Amino acid sequence: MSYYIAPRFLDKLAVHITKNFLNIPGVRVPLILGIHGRKGEGKTFQCELAFEKMGIEVTLISGGELESPDAGDPARLIRLRYRETAELIKVRGKMCVLMINDLDAGAGRFDEGTQYTVNTQLVNATLMNIADNPTDVQLPGSYDSNPIRRVPIIVTGNDFSTLYAPLIRDGRMEKFYWEPNRDDKVGIVGGIFAEDGLSQREIEQLVDTFPKQSIDFFSALRSRIYDIQIRDFIHKVGFERISLRVVNSLEAPPEFKKPDFSLAHLIESGNLVLGEQQRVDNSQLVDEYNRLNRGRGYQTAPPPEAPVIQPVNNSSHKQKTSNTHLSLETQEQIRQILSQGHKITFEHVDARRFRTGSWQSCGTLHIDAESDAISTLEACLVDYDGEYVRMVGIDPKGKRRVVETIIQRPNGKN
């Protein structure tokens, strides 16, 4: 099967890799090429095709390997794989690269709900150090005075803004945003269905029917066409015997005839796949289970009217109700923070964890409306009665905290 390589993707990758192996006087070449873009657009697969075309050997690291129960292991892994790749260049006498897939998933910080660990810091710092000193990469606990070969690093991800900003500066990382245009999509989808007898015009019609879908949608669509034959095969063998027939059988592997790859059938199946996508997008069940996502405007139905609470002659109830009444001073602080263009979040901690500073989010993050802030704080005071509750003002541009004010203490004072 002959797959399509987008010319501008191939050019970008080839230039970056080749430039790192050339000695150009007076030119500082970024060691890292960061390829980012929407999910499912074939960033990794296009890299694999380019490597194969150029005859380049690749050392792979997954974003999932960038975390470990032991502090320092991921940073050591990066250094070890880098040195191994440098040795490959020396021994094989050919271009080799180090590739890290989904870097943002392993070393990025998405929101306050994402844990920032020692390994996250060390991974960012290690990549920065390697980018600054690509021929002097040492393993912890040892030192080699001999310089090693320079190894280009290719990283992929969806959102590099979640990474440590100094890592992605231009001197260390060259960025390439991959968003295939219509011609690229037609070429790539044509490669996916190359053996299925679709004409160029039918490929274009298929792409134009689903213009907002990523590349992996069409790959999944081709796989789905075989579902009917596989279902019939399962029914023929029997659910009880299918495991033995497929995994542990002396019979020849099952063969399937070429299914119907007509344009009409592909569009029909594509609409079914699209329908499942929309069900996921519209369900938003995470709002019901994850406190961090509440109040972000994801509701699929209007919220119910608040019930009328009748007065109850109960001292504990009166005490809790009184705790939710915000003082004029607190309301004025909220207005001042928001008027400066900052956003607000609220955090809580019990008395035991207060000493260690282990604050946790009350729920909604980055509030920018006064009414939302007041209602969220009132709810937080009710939910965490008897704990410390504080208000945090955040500068969205600098992504830093500008105000931290304790609103409630365990003794009940606001």
Curated annotation (Swiss-Prot):
Annotated Pfam families: AAA, RuBisCO_activase_AAA_helical, RuBisCO_small
Point to the regions of Polar residues compositional bias.
311-326
The record, for SUPFAM superfamilies, names: P-loop containing nucleoside triphosphate hydrolases (SSF52540), RuBisCO, small subunit (SSF55239)
Gene3D superfamilies the UniProt entry points to: 1.10.8.1070, P-loop containing nucleotide triphosphate hydrolases, Ribulose bisphosphate carboxylase, small subunit
Q: Where is this region: Disordered?
A: 296-326
What are this entry's molecular-function GO terms? ATP binding; ATP hydrolysis activity
Superkingdom as given in the UniProt entry: Bacteria
UniProt keyword annotations, A-Z: ATP-binding, Nucleotide-binding
Q: Which residues bind ATP?
A: G37, R38, K39, G40, E41, G42, K43, T44
What this chain does, per the record? Activation of RuBisCO (ribulose-1,5-bisohosphate carboxylase/oxygenase; EC 4.1.1.39) involves the ATP-dependent carboxylation of the epsilon-amino group of lysine leading to a carbamate structure.
Member of which family?
Answer: Belongs to the RuBisCO activase family.
The name under which this protein is listed is Ribulose bisphosphate carboxylase/oxygenase activase
Which lineage ranks, top first, belong to the organism behind this chain? Bacteria, Bacillati, Cyanobacteriota, Cyanophyceae, Nostocales
